[in-house]
Amino acid sequence: AVDFGEAIWNPASSSNYSTASNQTSAVIMHTMEGSYAGSISWFQNPSAQVSAHYLIRKSDGQITQMVREYHQAWHAKNHNYYTIGIEHDGRAADAGNWSAAMVNASARLTKSICARRGVNCASAWKGPGYDTFHLVPDSVRVKGHGMLSGNENRYDPGKYFPWSNYYNLINGGGGNP
C-alpha cells in the first residue's frame, strides 16, 4: 500500500530502513546523483544501508514509494526519525535537471505530506539554492539535504533547485499541484 495515491509501491530492502516510528515534522529534498532506475535498484540492495521514502523520475514525474511514511528511511543521518525523504532523478550540479514534470510531481507529493502529517508548508525554504553545504534554521521544515546539521558533506538538491517556485507550488501559488 502507498501513502500517496499517485505513487507506485516498490519496496526498499528491509535492511535499508528502520521500522521505528517516524515522528514526521519535516520533508527533505535530495538528488539521486544517478538515475531513477539505478536508485530503485540500489535501495533494494540489502548492503546499501540507505533509502528514501519516495523517488521521482525526471522524464514524466512518476513517483515510486519505497519506504512507508511511518517508518524511518535512511537518508539524512541523525534526522531520519522525524523526516520524509524525497529523492529526485538526476544530479544537483546539472542546471537542466529540474523538469516541470518532476518539480510539479514533487510539489504535489510534498503538499500532500504536509497536509497528512501536520507539517507547515509555509515553513518551507524559499531562498536560493546552494552548491555547498548551507545550514538553515530548524524552523525551516521543507528543505534540502545539504541544509541539515551533520550533513556537511552534502549540498543536494543543489543551487539549481527552484526553491521560490516550489514554495509557491506547495503553498497554493498557481501551477499544477
Swiss-Prot record:
Primary localization: secreted
Lineage: Bacteria, Pseudomonadati, Pseudomonadota, Betaproteobacteria, Burkholderiales
Protein name according to UniProt: N-acetylmuramoyl-L-alanine amidase A
Disulfide feature: 114-121
Function: Antibacterial activity against Gram-positive bacteria M.luteus, S.aureus, E.faecalis and P.acidilactici and Gram-negative bacterium E.coli.
Protein EC: 3.5.1.28
Keyword Kinase: no
pH and activity: Optimum pH is 8.5.
Organism: Achromobacter lyticus
Gene (name only): cwhA
Catalytic activity: Hydrolyzes the link between N-acetylmuramoyl residues and L-amino acid residues in certain cell-wall glycopeptides
GO molecular function: N-acetylmuramoyl-L-alanine amidase activity
Protein keywords: Antibiotic, Antimicrobial, Cell wall biogenesis/degradation, Disulfide bond, Hydrolase, Secreted
